[in-house]
């Protein structure tokens, strides 16, 4: 077990001074906020965060606020500490701005980002994150506290094996959820038809 800051650089996201104004199309940057991340987690049964699924904004700030795809994003407030992996893709040309609601983790060469996301979401690590948070009404994770968190670092080969198994598991969950949704829609149609026949 080693401290998190020995295998990842950790910084906070960008502090927006005003309400974030999202645009449907025509933005020049993507934005990451907790509300959008939670919805993507729930809808997709995955902690992989495709950049193109994020809302767009018209960005007028500096370039140093941009976050590279391949980073791990960890919510820093509100008691929801599920990490996300910002999935790299060749088709995305716009930069990404992450709000200060998140801590941004950029792993070193000894840690695969997708594995870091996975291990942070495991029950033992989630308990450690909750215990490390401060505040009662609005729990917060501080970067300095997170840096001292102890984490297991298996070989890169083992990390890759875990990633591949987790991808299969997430895919199975997505297929199962889709089948259940289709079944639900079919039954709703049957119920409506039966009700019509009784009138």
Model-derived features: where do they sit?
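Non-catalytic DNA-recognition/assembly elements of restriction-modification systems
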Residues: 1-27, 153-199
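Basic, amphipathic alpha-helical recognition segments used for DNA target recognition
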Residues: 4-8, 100-153
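Sequence-specific dsDNA recognition surfaces
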Residues: 5-20, 37-69
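Short, surface-exposed loop/turn microsegments at beta-strand edges and helix-strand junctions
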Residues: 21-29, 49-51, 65-67, 85-99
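A structural connector/turn signal
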Residues: 61-62, 92, 136
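Generic structural signal for buried aliphatic residues
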Residues: 72-74
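A short beta-sheet element
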Residues: 76-118
């Amino acid at each position: 077990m080693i401290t998190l800051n020995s295998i990842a650089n950790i910084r906070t996201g960008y502090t927006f001074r005003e309400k974030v104004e999202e645009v449907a199309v025509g933005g020049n940057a993507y934005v990451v906020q907790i509300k959008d991340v939670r919805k993507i987690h729930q809808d997709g049964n995955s902690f992989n965060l495709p950049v193109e699924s994020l809302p767009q904004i018209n960005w007028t700030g500096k370039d140093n606020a941009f976050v590279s795809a391949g980073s791990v994003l960890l919510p820093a407030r509100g008691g929801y500490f599920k990490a996300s992996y910002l999935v790299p893709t060749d088709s995305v040309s716009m930069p990404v701005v992450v709000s200060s609601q998140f801590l941004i983790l950029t792993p070193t060469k000894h840690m695969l980002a997708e594995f870091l996301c996975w291990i942070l979401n495991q029950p033992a690590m989630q308990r450690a994150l909750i215990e490390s948070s401060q505040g009662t009404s609005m729990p917060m994770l501080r970067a300095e506290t997170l840096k001292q968190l102890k984490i297991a670092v298996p070989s890169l080969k083992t990390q890759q094996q875990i990633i591949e198994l987790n991808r299969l598991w997430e895919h199975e969950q997505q297929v199962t959820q889709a089948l259940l949704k289709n079944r639900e829609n079919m039954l709703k149609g049957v119920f409506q038809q039966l009700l019509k026949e009784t009138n």
